[in-house]
């Protein structure tokens, strides 16, 4: 089925045939289509970010990061549709690989076998290793951001909240609210240190999300479906128990310490009781990813060597990514001073830079 291009106001070249709407978000629409010259099936994401600075930031992050990473378990950018001029530049069109579904939909529609859980966790960790090797935190890992196709290939998507874990350059500001501001990721997959405002977030926040995703695949429902901030923390503590003194002392926020002190003591629950279908190796991986203290949490490299994913682990085929160039995230540290027009100009310049992919090469050579 071909949709009417004028109906949805998609300004893309005639080299693309639009077929169906496959997703809609706060500031974007995703349409499945075909790149006619090559016959490649694609997803075209139309983003309209210029009404809000936050959307501009996310869009610029996403384009820059998708351009940087070339990895089997990270969604790739195939093309950026170039606008006719800066004056008519009101939308961004990102062309990506078309994936048939996502893990959220799969979990809701069927019970996953342990083999599926292993393979999906392994691929998530493999993609995450590439991100972390470049000092990038995803910060919003959740089932709907893990795209899947019929072969069970998994790709991490949505880098709008991703940030560098490197320290801000000297003499720059991150808004004065502590390292890592503007955190609005889905509450259910947020690590305790995010909830309790530890001074800095580390790569460990993504491993917490992996643990939540594994438990959700095993149980068929979210592990910590908090209704609000207080309920979310309560659900986490019902499972992990009251923090030990060592864990408690890692918290840098006095307000968070006072909040925890006021709560009733709770005993730790066993993950084998919470996830009764889980194999012993899965239970062990849950224990090591879902720790209260980020310093005690397993790293992505350690998780790839865990017995739960040993059927897939191949140290020679789990590549690191190229390091980010110095200044890659510089725009983050001047965000308060930038006008909307300056954001627009930066995104325009990024879009003007061609993406060297199969699609662009095909179009140029034919």
Curated annotation (Swiss-Prot):
It catalyses: L-seryl-[protein] + ATP = O-phospho-L-seryl-[protein] + ADP + H(+); L-threonyl-[protein] + ATP = O-phospho-L-threonyl-[protein] + ADP + H(+). Belongs to the protein kinase superfamily. CMGC Ser/Thr protein kinase family. MAP kinase subfamily. GO terms for molecular function: ATP binding; MAP kinase activity; protein serine kinase activity; protein serine/threonine kinase activity. Activated by tyrosine and threonine phosphorylation. Gene3D superfamilies: Phosphorylase Kinase, domain 1, Transferase(Phosphotransferase) domain 1. Its EC number is 2.7.11.24. Keywords: ATP-binding, Kinase, Nucleotide-binding, Phosphoprotein, Serine/threonine-protein kinase, Transferase. ATP binds at residues 22-30, 45. It is an enzyme of class 2 (transferase). Residues 17-302 form the Protein kinase domain. The lineage of its organism: Eukaryota, Fungi, Dikarya, Basidiomycota, Agaricomycotina. A motif (TXY) lies at residues 181-183. It comes from Cryptococcus neoformans var. neoformans serotype D (strain JEC21 / ATCC MYA-565). One of its GO terms (cellular component) is nucleus. The TXY motif contains the threonine and tyrosine residues whose phosphorylation activates the MAP kinases. This is Mitogen-activated protein kinase CPK1. Responds to activation by environmental stress by phosphorylating downstream targets. SUPFAM superfamilies: Protein kinase-like (PK-like) (SSF56112).
